[in-house]
């Protein structure tokens, strides 16, 4: 982490519904704490331990598995159809929402971090395909481990999805940004983002792995 990085460690549980909606609409990110309890996290970790994963093209220490929605069971009950998450998404987007993607990711010790990027690319891309071209999408990132400063915490550039500047080209990637923010969170929480905001994560310089379930939803309209 850069020594100049800000840390957003506010009490997210104190936000009202209106404040949560404003946070993700204007700032581009939001934390919903305590969506999964300790037993649910343990059950999901037992499941993920059985999955075969692939390494990303930039690091053997970053592993992933796509299309986890087809595993059903716990993934559907605890994650995809999590009632508290859906309640918020319905308030944000309307009653009808569509799941666009569901991915598992594990950042192991030695993971170099992910550069600042967007998941929203209006003409599609080889990485995100047509899903990235949806004009509105919310990414919901469930963390099965604590997001601490040394184990790949989330990073984001607030309000970057609002910029018209050429530097906000959604196909760009950046190593760092002077206004980037580190967002810690406890296991069982989810970070929600506007898919057009620039975000990534910091390196894993700790001794443990960090597991995440990343879902994408868009309003049906």
Q: At which residue positions do the language-model features occur?
A:
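A structural signal for short, well-ordered beta-strand segments
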Residues: 101-104, 140-142, 213-217
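Short hydrophobic-aromatic micro-motifs
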Residues: 32, 142, 191-193
């Amino acid at each position: 982490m850069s020594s100049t990085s800000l840390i957003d460690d506010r009490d997210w549980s104190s936000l009202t519904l209106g404040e949560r909606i404003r946070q993700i609409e204007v700032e581009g990110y939001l934390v919903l704490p305590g969506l999964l309890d300790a037993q649910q996290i343990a059950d999901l970790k037992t499941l993920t331990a059985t999955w075969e994963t692939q390494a990303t093209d930039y690091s053997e220490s970053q592993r992933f598995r796509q299309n986890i929605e087809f595993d059903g069971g716990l993934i559907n009950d605890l994650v995809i159809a999590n009632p508290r998450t859906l309640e918020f998404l319905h308030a944000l987007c309307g009653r009808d929402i569509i799941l666009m993607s569901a991915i598992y990711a594990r950042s192991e010790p030695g993971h170099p971090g992910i550069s600042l990027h967007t998941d929203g690319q209006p003409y599609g891309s080889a990485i995100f395909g047509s899903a990235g071209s949806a004009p509105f999408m919310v990414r919901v990132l469930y963390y099965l481990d604590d997001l601490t400063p040394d184990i790949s915490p989330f990073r984001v550039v607030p309000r970057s999805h609002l910029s018209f500047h050429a530097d906000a080209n959604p196909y760009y990637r950046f190593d760092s940004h002077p206004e980037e923010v580190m967002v810690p969170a406890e296991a069982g929480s989810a970070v929600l983002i506007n898919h057009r905001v620039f975000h990534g994560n910091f390196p894993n310089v700790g001794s443990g792995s960090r597991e995440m379930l990343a879902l994408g939803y868009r309003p049906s309209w």
